[in-house]
Amino acid sequence: MSQHVMFNAVLSSHPALFIQGEWRIGNGVSFEKQDPMSQQRLWQARAADHTDVTLACHAARAAFPAWARASLEQRATVIQQFAALLEQHKQSLARTISLETSKPYWETLTEVQAMIGKVAISLQAYQTRTGHSQTPMGDSMSVLRHRPHGVLAVFGPYNFPGHLPNGHIVPALLAGNTVVFKPSELTPWTAEETVKLWQQAGIPDGVLNLVQGGRETGEALAAQPDIDGLLFTGSAHTGYHLHRQLAGQPEKMLALEMGGNNALIVEQVKDRDAVVNLAIQSPFISAGQRCTCSRRLLVKTGAEGDAFLLRFTAVAQALRIGRWDEQPAPFMGAVISSQAAERMLAAQQHLLLLGGESLLNMTRPDSQSALLTPGIIDITNISEVPDEEYFGPLVSVIRYTDFTEALKIANQTRFGLAVGLVSEDRQQFEQLLLEARAGIVNWNKPLTGASSAAPFGGVGASGNHRPSAFYAADYCAWPMASLECEHLTLPATLSPGISFDLPKV
């Protein structure tokens, strides 16, 4: 707790921007981060204004040639040193993430471990997806190489403030790009501590730059002529805004990883508690603040489905919630802010007014805290269900009669991130694979389960395909194809119409 108290003493003028290898005080407005549980101030500094953002982009541009020309081994050495420092500082960084996000400590430890694992996976992805290959073609060689874009802007989210931006920063740097990192204004402290580790790892000046702030800072960064691409993780609302802002600029690479209105289909309930455990993990892990969380729980009508829902509701009601460091450890903490808590309660009320039936009422035990209890609402009888991602611990139940109807309901969304099936019928899963409009399709596993060794992303309003996890490498380098021949000789057979049977000049 001493770390928490010490940080409260930091003045608003503390240097929270990292530009050209130096920590600087921003020229923008002062903003702060509060503990979601206690509303106590954790962090305060000044945001980056347009001048700061321009300076960061210029620094990244100036640093690009040398970093891009460095060997892969040289770049990998710095990145591997960063991973080693993450290992050394795993507990302190996990505590920082817990304080900012309210996620339990056991969960944030796994987040930092995922950051460490991302380095080895990114090296593998670089070689597999964007490496160097040669194909003989007679007297020549077809060679495929990949080149970095240049300056990439990375926009990070608040739900995984360490792991998700790390999943773009690491492959971007490995490919030879330089980066301007703009984290969520709701998790500035995690970003600052992470960049300090990059500095200790020996990242060259200007290769990685940090600009802090909210919407104004983000818009200034997206509008910079000096960026060659933008990698974004966050809400569909913000992603759409960035897409419009960069419209008409096809020369800039835009990678959007957004949210989902994901469906989990409970078709069979053989082991009731095993199914309930999976169904609890899917909507309520991280207080429902994962893009892959199930927002819709599709349950087959009948006695088996009724019994499952009763057990599911009882287990959800008994979930331990609380502060990140409480013992025994809680399953989930608060949502990210009081404003987020208010939005979730408003969403629940809206669904009830539309005709939904509350199976478990989501509540806010303390009006001064962003802590919410899990909520379950049956929306089967709502004629026009809002196609929204409610980013918190609220799941909507929809009853269905047969599997064909379940598939139809699952696809009734503009999003296309994740869908899951609980069933022991392999043929049903094969049918789901054929008909699902989603980038992630899980079978008898929580929707929130995903592998960094696989592509991650969705279609529709969930983003432009796979800008995260293993395929992030694709967005960090562009392919360069070459036909190469060391010695030029006249072909034995000439093209029709060409003759060299001419008088010598």
Swiss-Prot record:
GO biological process: arginine catabolic process to glutamate; arginine catabolic process to succinate
EC number from the UniProt entry: 1.2.1.71
Listed pathway(s): Amino-acid degradation; L-arginine degradation via AST pathway; L-glutamate and succinate from L-arginine: step 4/5
Matching Pfam families: Aldedh (PF00171)
Stored InterPro entries: Ald_DH/histidinol_DH, Ald_DH_C, Ald_DH_CS_CYS, Ald_DH_CS_GLU, Ald_DH_N, Aldehyde_DH_dom, SuccinylGlu_semiald_DH_AstD
Claim: Oxidoreductase is one of the keywords in the record: yes
Catalytic residues in the record: 257, 291
UniProt KW keywords: Arginine metabolism, NAD, Oxidoreductase
Keyword Methyltransferase: no
GO function term, MF aspect, one: succinylglutamate-semialdehyde dehydrogenase activity
Binding annotation for NAD(+): 234-239
Record SUPFAM superfamilies: ALDH-like (SSF53720)
Function: Catalyzes the NAD-dependent reduction of succinylglutamate semialdehyde into succinylglutamate.
HAMAP family the record matches: Aldedh_AstD
Assigned protein family: Belongs to the aldehyde dehydrogenase family. AstD subfamily.
Protein name: N-succinylglutamate 5-semialdehyde dehydrogenase
